[in-house]
Amino acid sequence: KRVSDEKLYGDNDLVDEKHLARHCIGLSGIGFSDEEIEDLADRIREMKKKDTQICCSIGFLTEKQARILKDAGLDRINHNLNSSRSFYPEICTTHTYDQRVNNIKMLQSLGFEICSGGIVGMGESKEDIVDMLMDLREINPESVPINFLLPIPGTKLADRDISELTPEYCMKVLCLA
């Protein structure tokens, strides 16, 4: 569903008013049409009039689509690895871990800053966490968000036991990152 211009630009005014460094646009879905990308590019150009850094969580892009957004002024893209290569098939069946890594590398080659991290608490092992962090080190993103699972009713991980996610455990993971 397309967010209204009023909401999007109103949020951008707030970023400017509060002197925040960046405005992040989060989108959901797998793949966007060229028309949707052009629409987003127009909106980014409008937002850039505020001298605000723009970040977008948009999923997979073609190189053509990424260039359109780069030319519009998009600064940073969030594309998380989410997990380790070996655990990834347990949480995602629509695409592969390598597709995520390749998408990030393509975006980096076009000059985007990258925000990429993962989610802890989905049933992965400690070795999986270390493997994900080592892959992130190789990718070398500008920002590494580490998220901790909060099970949501109605989702695949709704019944996941997160008792291991104590404050101490979470701090250890963050220290490794």
Model-identified regions with their sequence ranges:
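Conserved C-terminal portion of the radical SAM core fold
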Residues: 25, 49-51, 98-156, 170-177
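Short, well-ordered secondary-structure micro-motifs
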Residues: 67, 90, 126-128, 155-163
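Core AdoMet radical
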Residues: 1-9, 15-103, 113-117, 142-147
